[in-house]
């Protein structure tokens, strides 16, 4: 799904009304109803008892009044707070404010600091706070009572000992977050969940402050999907289930192991044999028909014992226990690579100069699609432009920000300041696909197209997670090929994050192990298939 900026979103709303005859009031009604449903879903089977709906004077506030109307029959106490004088409301927002009052809804006006101070103790003691203050129409920074409200809300404790509020839900976007990707220019509300409408907003995906969004959900309110594609002029897409509907995720009953490719993984060294095991296991669990793990002979027994289902191949070792250059002598490595579908290189191979030369040579000389990660990337530090001289048409590099900084000769801070630009520039420069890992991983193709992934959690911030991702990307390439490689790679990143979510449903993310992420890949894939089936 395309991500839109604020101007594009306004245009979609306008055309939905003018071209397709959907009244703007109906769009607001649908938006508010979705907000109410999201709140109630979050608390099934125990409904929240106290809800505070914070409304600004614009259409975002109007959405909030609609949501309040739908919610009021399901809770013990619900109060709406209007951060404006009623006469400042216009259009659909004014209509829904009146409907809220006519339904018997309670409204507290917040027009001065004293009013906010008096209301705050009650708001701080609610189960749910709905943020309908500013929305996507923000220009400049939040000020006045809204700025104070954001500051106070951000100070609320969210730990197990003081669980209120259980949910802070942003309507369309967190108050204070610009929609077009820039950093917030003032106070920014950090929420548990954001329910946005029609399409994700660019800022929710790529802003340096995007973590404020929490869990992002998108709900349609009546605008045709084709209109989003028509109006959106950018190449930024959100990696969501619909993007993968065209891939053969469900296997044919008469398929066999040869139908799903053969991954060759060059990985591991003394002290880093686990990286090879993790990547190899992930490739198997992610669906590759066959997997061969090529490792230095000194760690071959450990890697062989790590998983019964993959095959292994010994690589000649340096004195340091890493892959030696003499693996290139004769046909030794050529025979190992013969008959394989994809080559994945890098997890745990080490940074010995001789090993790095071996890595550079096999990457530049193979005609197989290549997934290059970890120490494999470090082999090209200071020599990254040589990747353009490779034989294979298909190269995917998977750096974290530090590795990308070394490849591009920039600081990590520079990379993080504009992650999309860094990934797009690298993809163009090396004529490669780039998976720039981190919060909201970027997947960029050499033609400028970009996916942003929002699945995953902080449990992935642990050693071995990248090795698992390498295995997943290689396995999906083996299964689905390179005709739609950007989409296939985006699927891999999506499943990696979704597996982390599945593995931590009943546990804290701090204890998540990379191997547990690998084990949850089938669950993530099943979830995706079922969601696509549900959508029809």
Put a short name on every predicted segment.
Residues 1-85, 90, 94, 193, ...:
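Small-residue (G/A/S/T)-rich helix-start motifs and N-terminal tracts that mark the onset
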Residues 69-158, 163, 301, 306-317, ...:
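N-terminal small/polar loop signature for handling phosphorylated ligands or for N-terminal nucleophile
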Residues 112-116, 173-179, 202, 376-379:
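Short acidic loop-to-helix transition motifs that present clustered carboxylates
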Residues 127-128, 133-234:
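Internal gly/pro-rich beta-alpha loop/helix module
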């Amino acid at each position: 799904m395309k991500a839109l900026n604020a101007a594009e979103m306004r245009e979609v709303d306008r055309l939905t009304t003018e071209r397709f005859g959907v009244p703007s009031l109906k769009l607001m009604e649908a938006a508010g109803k979705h907000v109410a449903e999201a709140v109630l879903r979050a608390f099934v089977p125990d409904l929240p008892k106290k809800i505070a709906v914070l409304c600004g004077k614009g259409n975002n506030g109007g959405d909030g009044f609609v949501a309040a109307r739908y919610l009021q029959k399901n809770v013990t106490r619900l109060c709406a707070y209007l951060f404006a004088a009623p006469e400042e409301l216009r259009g659909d927002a004014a209509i829904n404010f009146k409907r809220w009052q006519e339904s018997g809804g309670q409204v507290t006006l917040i027009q001065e600091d004293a009013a906010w101070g008096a209301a705050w103790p009650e708001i701080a003691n609610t189960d749910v706070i709905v943020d309908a203050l500013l929305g996507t129409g923000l220009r400049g920074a939040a000020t006045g009572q809204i700025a104070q409200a954001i500051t106070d809300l951000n100070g609320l404790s969210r730990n197990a000992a003081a669980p209120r509020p259980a949910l802070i839900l942003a309507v369309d976007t967190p108050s204070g977050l610009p929609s077009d990707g820039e950093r917030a220019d003032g106070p920014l509300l950090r929420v548990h969940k954001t329910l946005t409408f029609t399409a994700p907003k660019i800022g929710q995906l790529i802003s340096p402050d995007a973590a404020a969004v929490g869990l992002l959900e998108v709900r349609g309110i009546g605008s045709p999907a084709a209109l989003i594609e028509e109006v959106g002029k950018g190449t930024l897409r959100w990696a969501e289930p619909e993007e993968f509907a065209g891939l053969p995720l469900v296997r044919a009953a008469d398929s066999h192991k040869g139908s799903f490719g053969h991954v060759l993984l060059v990985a591991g060294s003394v002290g880093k044999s686990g990286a090879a095991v993790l990547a190899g296991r992930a490739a198997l669990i992610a669906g590759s028909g066959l997997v061969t793990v090529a490792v230095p002979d000194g760690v071959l027994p450990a890697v062989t014992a790590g998983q019964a289902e993959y095959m292994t191949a010994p690589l000649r070792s340096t004195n340091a226990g890493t892959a030696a250059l003499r693996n290139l002598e004769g046909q030794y490595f050529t025979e190992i690579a013969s008959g394989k579908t994809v080559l994945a290189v890098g997890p745990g191979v080490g940074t010995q100069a001789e090993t790095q030369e071996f890595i550079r040579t096999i990457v530049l000389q193979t005609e197989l699609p290549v997934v290059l990660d970890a120490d494999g990337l470090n082999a090209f530090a200071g020599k990254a432009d040589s990747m353009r001289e490779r034989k294979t048409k298909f190269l995917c590099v998977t750096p974290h920000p530090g590795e990308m900084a070394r490849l591009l000769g920039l600081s990590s801070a520079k990379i993080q300041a504009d992650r999309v630009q860094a990934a797009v520039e690298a993809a163009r420069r090396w004529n490669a696909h780039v998976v720039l890992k981190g919060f909201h991983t970027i997947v960029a193709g050499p033609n400028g197209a970009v996916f942003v992934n929002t699945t995953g959690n902080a449990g992935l911030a642990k050693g071995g997670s990248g090795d698992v991702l390498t295995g997943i990307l290689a396995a999906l390439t083996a299964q689905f090929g390179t005709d739609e490689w950007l989409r296939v790679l985006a699927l891999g990143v999506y499943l990696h994050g979704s597996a982390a979510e599945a593995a931590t449903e009943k546990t804290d993310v701090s204890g998540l192990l990379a191997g547990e992420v690998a084990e949850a890949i089938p669950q993530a894939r099943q979830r995706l298939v079922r969601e696509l089936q549900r959508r029809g």
